[in-house]
Amino acid sequence: GVKYYDFDGKETSLLKVLHDNGVNYIRIRIWNDPTNEKGETYGGGANDVAAGLEIAKEAAQYDMKLLLDFHYSDFWADPALQKIPKAWGKDKNDTEKMKQNVYDFTKDTIKKFQEVGADIGMVQVGNEITNGMLDIMPDYSKGETYKDTWGNAKNAKILCGYLKAGIKAVRECTPKALVTLHLESMGYGKCSEIMNAWEQNGVDYDVFGSSFYQFWQGNSSKNALAGLQKIENLAKSRGKMYAVMETSWLNSLKDADGTPNVIGEGH
């Protein structure tokens, strides 16, 4: 397995290293059931509720706040894929049952984290939901986009119903926690249109979040730092706070494995 060391070369816990160097807030990804029919995990850390609770227990020892990131999926949920959890598949065409699933899972999970002493400061309802969530997504084969989900009155109402179900659970279980809605995009027009749909459907949230990968696809111009200020100002104009939900950076430009790097010496 992976081992972590402090700056003195002593093997120790990753969370201790982070805490000792000023990190006071961590984001825990939550998947519903990241296993196949044989019980084998899909990979990616197998971040189900049980795995998240183990992280939360240790984080509590270091007085770290938690951001719980609900994907409402068994694996990665992002702009390309927002697949319904296996256990909810039978309810795909029943909007009311799906809302109940979201509410119940969110509430039950938050309670479990509270029982292990987690300090929940923020809850993210959905992950990178730019194009939709829970299988309400554009038909890319027909050239559809986010406008066919969030810009479609019927779809937007259903999607916002799911968001409100999750948010209701958060408000009931941990009323002091901030509710975050997270898009991958930093496109001003796109973000504004989606926020319009939330507003028109009465979605109650505190923080607008985006991802920020400056060299995504090797192109820094699409994700320049100036864009962050524009999106922050957009959030403020709607009475919301703004936060970067995802980012990363490299520690070396060198090639380590002979496969192409997203960012390399050529950049």
Give the role of each language-model region:
Residues V2-D20, G52, V102-K112, Y188-Q200:
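Short, acidic/polar
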Residues T12-L15, C160-G161, K168, E172-H182, ...:
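Glycoside hydrolase catalytic-domain groove-lining segments
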Residues D6, T41-Y42, A80-K83, M137-Y140, ...:
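Short, glycine/charged-enriched secondary-structure capping and boundary segments
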Residues D6-G9, D33, M64, F215:
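Intrinsically disordered, low-complexity regions enriched in small/polar residues
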Residues G1-K3, E58, Y62, E96-Q100, ...:
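Proteins with a high burden of low-complexity, intrinsically disordered sequence enriched in S/T/G/P/A and R
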